[in-house]
Regions:
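Acetyl-CoA-dependent GNAT
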Residues: 10-11, 18-94, 99, 104, ...
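Conserved acetyl-CoA-binding loop-helix of GNAT-fold acetyltransferases
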Residues: 100-103, 109-122, 148
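C-terminal "cap" of GNAT-fold acetyltransferases
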Residues: 135-139, 149, 156-178
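Helix-turn-helix
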Residues: 142
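Conserved active-site tyrosine of GNAT-family acetyltransferases
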Residues: 145-147, 151
């Protein structure tokens, strides 16, 4: 398995052919006044061909605008990826946005998300970020992943980065070696 930063030449129309976005969501966190409560839900998150085409264009746009796509490959198949924007923001320009981190269904719960996250952190540090900003989908599994790796509630909230009304705004403090 290889994890690498993608270049424009790595992006092609068939790159998501084997990527399986399928996810059954049975519980999500919802904000109730000042607390988060777990609620039962029932829906499927998946990508059709149009959504995959959209994602490929999104990858190209990201790279062209100075951001990064980190891809994980099994042989030649893209099985996981993350997207970080290329510009700093926040009151002290301390944040960089991690706007996507997805693992193909067959490869989840095997440590791949954590491995990609480590690479994301290294790349964010190279861009002089102090923290990752994550507007996370509120699915129980997604929040459990981010909390397990050390994410905390975001100290600053950026409404323009919230994709869905129930997203949980998180941050991760990056570690700089001395």
């Amino acid at each position: 398995m290889e994890i690498k930063q993608l270049k424009i030449s790595d992006i092609h129309p068939n790159m998501l052919n084997y990527f399986n976005r399928y996810q059954e969501v049975t519980q999500c966190w919802r904000r109730n006044e000042n607390n988060w409560v777990l609620e039962d839900v029932s829906y499927i998150r998946d990508w059709d061909e149009n959504k995959k085409k959209w994602a490929i264009n999104y990858f190209l746009q990201c790279i062209e605008q100075g951001g990064m796509i980190i891809g994980a490959f099994d042989e030649y198949n893209l099985i996981g990826f993350a997207k970080i924007d290329g510009k700093l923001f926040g009151s002290l320009n301390q944040y960089i946005n991690l706007s996507l981190l997805l693992i193909s269904n067959e490869y989840r719960h095997k440590g791949l998300g954590s491995r990609i996250f480590v690479t994301v952190c290294e790349k964010a540090i190279s861009l002089n970020a102090k923290k990752l900003y994550i507007s996370a989908h509120s699915a129980k599994d997604a929040i459990a992943f981010y909390k397990k790796i050390g994410c905390k509630d975001a100290q600053e909230i950026f409404q323009e980065l919230i994709d869905e009304p129930n997203d949980w705004e998180l941050e991760y403090e990056l570690c700089y070696s001395r």
